[in-house]
Swiss-Prot record:
Residues spanning the signal sequence: none
Descriptive protein name: Peptide chain release factor 1
PTM comment, free text: Methylated by PrmC. Methylation increases the termination efficiency of RF1.
Stated role: Peptide chain release factor 1 directs the termination of translation in response to the peptide chain termination codons UAG and UAA.
Gene3D superfamilies: 3.30.160.20, 3.30.70.1660, 6.10.140.1950
Residues spanning the membrane: none
Location (main, coarse): cytoplasm
Coiled-coil spans in chain: none
In-chain residues carrying the UniProt-annotated modification N5-methylglutamine: Q235
Domain of life per record: Bacteria
Keywords: Cytoplasm, Methylation, Protein biosynthesis
Species of provenance: Azoarcus sp. (strain BH72)
Classification via InterPro entries: PCRF (IPR005139), Pep_chain_release_fac_I (IPR000352), Pep_chain_release_fac_I_sf (IPR045853), Prokaryotic/Mito_RF (IPR050057), RF-1 (IPR004373)
Amino acid sequence: MKQSIRDKLEHLAGRLAELDRELSSEDATRDMNAFRDLSRERAELEPVVALYGAYRQAEQDCATARELLDDPEMQELGRSELEAGEARIAALDGDLQRALLPRDPNDERNLFLEIRAGTGGDEAALFAGDLLRMYSRYAERQRWRVEIVSSNPSDLGGYKEVIARIVGAGAYSRLKFESGGHRVQRIPVTETQGRIHTSACTVAVMPEADELAAVEINPADLRIDTFRASGAGGQHINKTDSAVRITHLPTGLVVECQDDRSQHRNKAQAMAVLAARLNDAQLRARQSAEAATRRSLIGSGDRSERIRTYNFPQGRVTDHRINLTLYKLDAVMQGELDELLAALVLEHQAEQLAALAEEGL
């Protein structure tokens, strides 16, 4: 282990001990906001320090095993213990390097999932509905909550555009690499000749801002229009101007919400989506700059990039960024995304480790 990494781990172990003292003091709960911040910091540090403790124990075990090598009667046991200890050290060293990687401050946030039908007309809209169902079922497996914020249904089912809010611990960290172009190859329900068509959708995953105040939005930059809602919502909703359209004039971003009967709630939802989009635009600009420097593919922020193909005749799904193909399309469409998402996280961590190595850290 590099001395710089060991020094950092020693510092974190000392900080954890300091936090334990602060949290156990009589004054700890006088300021509940500070108490929550300290508790959150402790929860982040504890697993890293525990790994470091296991690493130091493995080092001690290896030192003890080397002493046994000097005793002819204990050499075989010593070699066995040393081999096991060195294997533990190698594994823990990798775990510790990953644990020390820079954390994305958005990882624990809720998110807005935006799916837009692209090329392919009605078939693309149907696929947008399939993608929403796929992500919703994955969210259910994680015990997350899915709320439809805005939707524009197509005539044959599915969506021309749909925005959902996904609420749950670590939601953004799991799904943040899903942004990009998703392509489907299958025989559409409207196809009478049995020909395979190719359609596409664009997915955007945006972290929810903690508060609207966290994103600077000048009210003078907004044009807010109200109109009568259409589509699902019942007769009552069509009698009032409950739907809201907000245009951010400097960027041209437009958000519509009409799924609630309350104009006030539709406006609040639209403002939340607008804040997430503005925040996400800044995030993608940073990611794009980093990707240009590191030649990164994962998390590059490029929405125009085709990231995945779903081939129904072959029952396969291919993620083009990491050249991963799984012949379990049915399971994936039912929300079994863990294998795909885990592979993307590992690739991202490998890129981060390579970047740190280049910087000499």
